[in-house]
Amino acid sequence: KAANKILSAYLNLLTVYPDQPYDQPEIIHPISGCTIVKPEDMADFQTVLPKEEKMLEIVRAKIAAGERVMIYTSWTRTDTQRKLLGLLREEGIRTEILSTQIVPEKREDWLSKRLSAGAQVIITNPKCVETGLDLNAFTTLIFYSMGYNLFTLRQASRRSWRINQTAPRVEVYMLYYADT
């Protein structure tokens, strides 16, 4: 059991570290209590990382073309959504976060109200749109981080490409760091 806990902690660290190379917890041996790994902070919350720059580049171009963008972030224990929200709002881009705290039955209404109020970008966990939402208003989907569940990924990537979609194309971007 100890090996599984250590492996799980390593896997979580290795998956999230490229996106948030700061403020990561130490990996502690579950029996001895000794520190196994103390992740080095390679940046901080204020540092704009290369993946964030790429996301901003895509969003700027899409907003300039009059399109709306949905950004998916899978890791809920990080501050990625809050950081992306700040970066986009600093650019004057009207951005909202569709949080998991909004119950599924109210998400469509929540989204409709935000779009009517002029939201250009929505940031959410792909599980929030896994079922029941048509996202035809969004012609660009950016997977900033991806989880392990391919069903969720496929469902989220198809939310904008529905039978009643009138846009000539829907673009899906999956951002990642090379050699990771």
Predicted regions and their residues:
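SF2 helicase/translocase ATPase core recognition
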Residues: 1, 124-180
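Conserved Helicase C-terminal RecA-like lobe
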Residues: 2-122, 127-133
